[in-house]
């Protein structure tokens, strides 16, 4: 009999939820992570008494009551509501696109006026079958909003002009004809008081954890420790990039402590012009309504990904989709290994969905 029932590769949200459920079911688990900390990309660290989101803003939101109840076992959530603003050459616009945005953009006051303005711009453009993101955006919100709030920002995010991006990406941007700045249309929303790391620590309570362990560098020896493996690393790396590397976008952060108590008045400010090199600035204290004398900001830069960089967003185009489908066949044929999470499934996952999937996989595994 092997020393552990499960070797869980990755101490992020998927790995932590699975480990928690497995331990609860009486299984012997070892969690390893190649980083020097748990919690994966939702890791928060205290700086000047402020919980800093090291890998970018993470705002928990869900419509799934069971998932909400699940996370509330491990943390108390505050009432933070995501209401980012856009800065376009010093003009400030509310996001998501709503009546506040339209009022600032055109001076319109009623939903009927805003709708008329957008319809007029859509008609002028005359796009019936959008072939790329630029056409899709203009066909949804007209030219003004596209030019000021989408074009530069999205181009920076993806490192290519909107004319070269697939139309479907823009579906992630909601449009509303109400004066409502709440970005997520979710029943439940907030940030765990004390940060995400403390929440994941609670999930992993009583589970053996080894950090700074590179699974793929010592795979055979680590595999020998456990009956089954739950792998949440990159699926292509697992197979030695045999079919080629899946593409990602990466993100780089410049974080600094400032000797002021309030730098920008909002947790998230998107810079939507093409000239500003960063995509947004995060002021971390506002996630937890902080009143500390100093503040910590992170400038976020979107970057091309190459092997060795931190993979953030899968590039969900046809080419990468087809390549992942081939890797998935290999993954499905791999005995005693469960592939899961953002990297293991090459998928953009919101946090609540990661938990949902991890719980459902754990239920099947542990039956």
Where do the language-model regions lie?
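Glycine-rich FAD pyrophosphate-binding loop
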Residues: 20-48
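Active-site/ligand-binding neighborhood in enzyme catalytic cores
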Residues: 89-93, 99-228, 232, 239
């Amino acid at each position: 009999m092997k020393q552990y029932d499960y070797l869980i590769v990755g101490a992020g949200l998927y790995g932590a939820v699975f480990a928690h459920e497995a331990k609860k079911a009486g299984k012997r688990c070892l969690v390893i992570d190649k980083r020097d900390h748990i919690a994966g990309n939702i890791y928060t660290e205290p700086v000047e008494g402020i919980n800093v989101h090291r890998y970018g803003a993470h705002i928990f939101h869900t419509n799934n009551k069971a998932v909400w109840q699940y996370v509330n076992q491990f943390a108390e959530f505050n009432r933070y509501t995501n209401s980012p603003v856009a800065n376009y050459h010093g003009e400030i616009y509310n996001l998501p696109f709503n009546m506040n945005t339209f009022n600032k953009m055109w001076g319109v006051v009623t939903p009927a006026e805003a709708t008329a303005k957008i319809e007029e711009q859509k008609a002028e453009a005359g796009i019936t079958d959008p072939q790329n993101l630029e056409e899709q955006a203009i066909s949804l919100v007209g030219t003004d909003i596209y030019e000021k709030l989408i074009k530069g920002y999205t181009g920076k995010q993806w490192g290519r002009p909107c004319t070269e991006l697939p139309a479907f990406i823009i579906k992630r941007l909601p449009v509303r004809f109400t004066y409502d700045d709440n970005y997520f249309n979710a029943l439940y929303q907030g940030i765990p008081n004390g940060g995400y790391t403390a929440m994941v620590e609670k999930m992993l309570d009583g589970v053996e954890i080894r950090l700074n362990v590179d699974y793929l560098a010592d795979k055979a020896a680590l595999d020998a420790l456990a009956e089954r493996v739950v792998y949440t690393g990159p699926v292509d790396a697992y197979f030695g990039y045999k079919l080629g590397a899946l593409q990602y976008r990466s993100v780089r952060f410049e974080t600094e402590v400032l000797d002021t108590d309030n730098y920008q008045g909002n947790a998230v400010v998107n810079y939507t012009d093409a000239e500003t090199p960063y995509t947004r600035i995060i002021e971390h204290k506002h996630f937890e309504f902080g009143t500390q004398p100093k503040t910590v900001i992170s400038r976020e830069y979107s970057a091309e990904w190459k092997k060795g960089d931190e993979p953030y967003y899968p590039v969900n185009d046809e080419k990468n989709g087809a390549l992942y489908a081939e890797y998935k066949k290999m993954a499905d044929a791999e005995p005693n290994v469960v592939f899961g999470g953002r990297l293991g499934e090459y998928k953009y996952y919101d946090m609540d969905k990661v938990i949902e999937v991890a719980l459902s996989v754990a239920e099947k595994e542990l039956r």
